[in-house]
């Protein structure tokens, strides 16, 4: 199964099984970093936004949010959660067509000018390796280990290059990553299982230290017929990769982004060997002024 086939059926039970994630705490930390590095308003793109929980929290802060994800199903859930009411005039794009993006973003801008904006979110069905926005953003974020899903080194560089293209000069890019320490020593080869009223899942993990790849075999049982108590079984295989901090720094620089800080998650301390999750803060190089 390819990475673009993940978060299919799982998307529709994702929020139910991820209800233990402290999104408010994660949001407060992320928002604090945005403020610290000067992003107090403007357009912010949330890459690998999933069902849009973090996207919505940032929209509530007043940012003009764009949520980007390659899973149509995850975005379908996001739209059901946040966009069904008063959102018919803003298109949900499944293709990266600049004219459509332009129309949607200009619509948002007009609402901002007239004071009618409700912090609507523009959701785009795109692979972040092929990111295509109309114009640039003040910041981009990618949290909840979305960047770990980029398992090829060349693809990681490609993502960073796309981010650089669509960031304002001086714009900020914040993303998190799970570490090798987490995959090897915390998660290990554990099997996680949960049973809920309408769905169950079995999550089997295997970490390959030589490649830094963690493989998840996810088996989902979803209730499809309540009357007859029938469940549908589906499987997804997910792959995430742990990267060396130095490699990520070098990759950012190669793409034209300066790595400002690497934090131990949810602290202001530098990342360390036993960090389980780390946050990178990068910035697009300022445009050089050529004096006559």
Task: Pin down the residues of each PLM region.
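Class I SAM-dependent methyltransferase SAM/SAH-binding core
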Residues: 45, 53-130
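Conserved class I S-adenosyl-L-methionine
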Residues: 1-42
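A short glycine-rich, Lys/Arg-flanked "PGG" loop and its adjoining helix->strand segment in the class I
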Residues: 157-169
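SAM-dependent methyltransferase
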Residues: 174-249
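Residues lining the SAM
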Residues: 143-145
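A short acidic, Gly/Pro-enriched loop at the edge of an enzyme's catalytic core
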Residues: 132-139
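C-terminal lobe and adjacent flexible extensions of AdoMet/dcAdoMet transferase-like proteins
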Residues: 239-292
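Conserved S-adenosyl-L-methionine
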Residues: 48
